[in-house]
Amino acid sequence: MEKRKMLIVFVLFSVLSLSSIWTAWSQSIPQIYQQSYEEEAKGNYQEAILVLMQASRGGDNSYLYHLRLGWLQYLGNKYTDSVNSYRKAAILTKDSIEAKLGLMLPLMAQGKWSEAEKVAKEILSLDPLSFLANSRLAYIYYNLKQYKDAEASYKKVLSYYPGDIEMQVGLAWSLLKQDKKEAAEKAFGEILRYVPNHVSANAGMKMVKGK
């Protein structure tokens, strides 16, 4: 009987202790995130990662935790870790476009163009007009040397955002890489009309003219 009482007391004590620990962690989660924001703002990405990971040790396995961790790891050039974190976020919320957009960043940073292309197409199946997915897909095609596809993708983006200079530059280079010099010259010329000191456009124009 005495042993039974002691066991009950022990169990109750353990439950209360765990509850207290969880409460303490729950209360500290906002502080952990806030500190990670502050370290990120200072450019201390490794420190921001270490701070944020304290939340995981406190039981935070949320979508937002993995999403933010993936972002910080990307900023800190920890691309493999970033891919893993973004994939975990995507698993937790399978239709999340933002997690997939995040995942594209470390894949592209590593030059994993085919993998990034696959993710871009997954996004476009959910949101066909996504500016980021379409513009990144155009850039991916360019880096895969699929210049005709890059041209088509840049034109698609420009049909909705005709004033986007960087998309115009991407299109001009895609044309030049296909040896469509007349079209490329016209495209570069249009850019330089409005942004005369654009470095990439000027470089492209020199190549068109064989300088």
What are the functions of these language-model segments?
Residues 58, 92, 125-126, 160-161, ...:
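Structural marker of alpha-solenoid helical repeat scaffolds
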Residues 28-30, 63-64, 97-98, 131-132, ...:
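Helix-start (N-cap) detector for alpha-helical repeat units in TPR-like alpha-solenoids
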